[in-house]
Swiss-Prot record:
<dbReference type="GO" id="GO:0051539">
    <property type="term" value="F:4 iron, 4 sulfur cluster binding"/>
</dbReference>
<feature type="binding site">
    <location>
        <position position="270"/>
    </location>
    <ligand>
        <name>[4Fe-4S] cluster</name>
    </ligand>
</feature>
<feature type="binding site">
    <location>
        <position position="273"/>
    </location>
    <ligand>
        <name>[4Fe-4S] cluster</name>
    </ligand>
</feature>
<protein>
    <recommendedName>
        <fullName>4-hydroxy-3-methylbut-2-en-1-yl diphosphate synthase (flavodoxin)</fullName>
        <ecNumber>1.17.7.3</ecNumber>
    </recommendedName>
</protein>
<comment type="function">
    <text>Converts 2C-methyl-D-erythritol 2,4-cyclodiphosphate (ME-2,4cPP) into 1-hydroxy-2-methyl-2-(E)-butenyl 4-diphosphate.</text>
</comment>
<feature type="binding site">
    <location>
        <position position="312"/>
    </location>
    <ligand>
        <name>[4Fe-4S] cluster</name>
    </ligand>
</feature>
<keyword id="KW-0479">Metal-binding</keyword>
<keyword id="KW-0004">4Fe-4S</keyword>
<dbReference type="GO" id="GO:0019288">
    <property type="term" value="P:isopentenyl diphosphate biosynthetic process, methylerythritol 4-phosphate pathway"/>
</dbReference>
<keyword id="KW-0560">Oxidoreductase</keyword>
<keyword id="KW-0411">Iron-sulfur</keyword>
<dbReference type="GO" id="GO:0016114">
    <property type="term" value="P:terpenoid biosynthetic process"/>
</dbReference>
<keyword id="KW-0414">Isoprene biosynthesis</keyword>
<comment type="pathway">
    <text>Isoprenoid biosynthesis; isopentenyl diphosphate biosynthesis via DXP pathway; isopentenyl diphosphate from 1-deoxy-D-xylulose 5-phosphate: step 5/6.</text>
</comment>
<dbReference type="InterPro" id="IPR011005">
    <property type="entry name" value="Dihydropteroate_synth-like_sf"/>
</dbReference>
<feature type="binding site">
    <location>
        <position position="305"/>
    </location>
    <ligand>
        <name>[4Fe-4S] cluster</name>
    </ligand>
</feature>
<comment type="similarity">
    <text>Belongs to the IspG family.</text>
</comment>
Length: 372
């Protein structure tokens, strides 16, 4: 029931990765990357499908060899989500996956080789309407830039990115997006800020090598949150040393927290104290797991007592306020019922699913009326 965030998005050029629009006000796309051996087709397909189930808009796959390129062909045939092929050094791999229907090429023109090889890749991408992502990383800056700046700096990342941008400009190719990633939050944020002022291309956000699930999520939330709150960013990846599925979940949580893009349940829950009248923590944990399949945007407040419960419930789609033996249930800010504290999880799950059905039907009818 909260209003969308008053964030003014940076104006950027529209490109498409498969059927997913990127830039020019399109919803910010959330993506991840497989960590299986690409030559293990079954494992890679299974992981991509798992990412699809939790809402991944785009999935990146590393293609380091020709054998991996042949595997990519089989993988592409078995999944629906757009795939980005991560290519380094061998331009022939880029040409091969383009032949096999890749939706986007992630390259650095600087490590593909000669001008002729870069032109071959760009010409192929143009002919097949395949966009390119220029991926600059603080950990792999060009040697001359390392010597010039002494260490990765925002100016160094910007200069590296602009070299590659200029290269594509000279080849009259404008279907690309750019990233300037670093593991240091401030370095990444300032690099993106500088780049956003220089070009109109879509920007892919990320804090690279952020760390494990907990620390990496925190770093990404801070770094990406700063940029997104300033209107910078058209697609993002939360890079975690964890199951890639978690990257998608955290990515959507960041967007939900900023009210930029809603997907699924946004739980508002108190940290609990001695006033709680039911097991808030157990209830929230159980419902997060049970309701992972729901994609209907909805705010659900679960508060253990009457201090803050009624106030949160007023601005939630559904809200529970802890009470003695039974807790108050609010719907769209109005108290509707009381739930038995001993059966809270099952009852609340049923109410949330029922509300999701109602909201989905209302959305369907609204779309039909607009299309008439």
């Amino acid at each position: 029931m909260h209003n969308q965030a008053p964030i003014q998005r940076r104006k950027s050029k529209r490109i498409y990765v498969g059927n997913v629009p990127i830039g020019d006000g399109a919803p910010i796309a959330v993506q991840s990357m497989t960590n299986t051996r690409t030559t293990d087709v079954a494992a890679t397909v299974n992981q991509i499908k798992a990412l699809e189930r939790v809402g991944a808009d785009i999935v990146r796959v590393s293609v380091p060899t020709m054998d991996a390129a042949e595997a990519f062909k089989l993988i592409k045939q078995q999944v629906n989500v757009p795939l980005v092929a991560d290519i380094h050094f061998d331009y022939r791999i880029a040409l091969k996956v383009a032949e096999y229907g890749v939706d986007c090429l992630r390259i650095n023109p600087g490590n593909i080789g000669s001008e002729e090889r870069i032109r071959a890749v760009v010409d192929c991408a143009r002919d097949k309407n395949i966009p390119i992502r220029i991926g600059v990383n603080a950990g792999s800056l060009e040697k001359d830039l390392q010597e010039k700046y002494g260490e990765p700096t925002p100016q160094a990342l910007l200069e590296s990115a602009m070299r590659h941008v200029d290269h594509l400009d000279r080849l009259n190719f404008d279907q690309f997006k750019v990233s300037v990633k670093a593991s240091d939050v401030f370095l990444a944020v300032e690099s993106y800020r500088l780049l956003a002022k220089q070009i109109e291309q879509p920007l892919h956000l990320g804090i690279t090598e952020a760390g494990g699930l907990r620390s990496g999520s925190v770093k990404s939330a801070i770094g990406l949150g700063l940029l997104l709150s300033e209107g910078i960013g058209d697609t993002l990846r939360v890079s975690l040393a964890a199951d890639p599925v978690e990257e998608i979940k955290v990515g959507f949580d960041i967007l939900k927290s900023l009210r930029i893009r809603a997907r699924g349940i946004n739980f508002i829950a108190c940290p609990t104290c001695s006033r709680q009248e039911f097991d808030v923590i157990g209830t929230v944990n159980a419902l997060e797991q049970r309701l992972e399949d729901l994609i209907t945007p909805m705010d659900v407040s679960i508060i253990g007592c009457v201090v803050n419960g009624p106030g949160e419930a007023l601005v939630s789609t559904l809200g529970v306020t802890g009470g003695n033996k039974k807790s108050g249930l609010y719907e769209d800010g109005i108290r509707k019922d009381r739930l038995d504290n001993n059966d809270m999880i099952d009852q609340l799950e049923a109410r949330i699913r029922a509300k999701a059905t109602i909201l989905d039907e209302a959305q369907r009818i609204s779309i039909q009326q607009i299309e008439k």
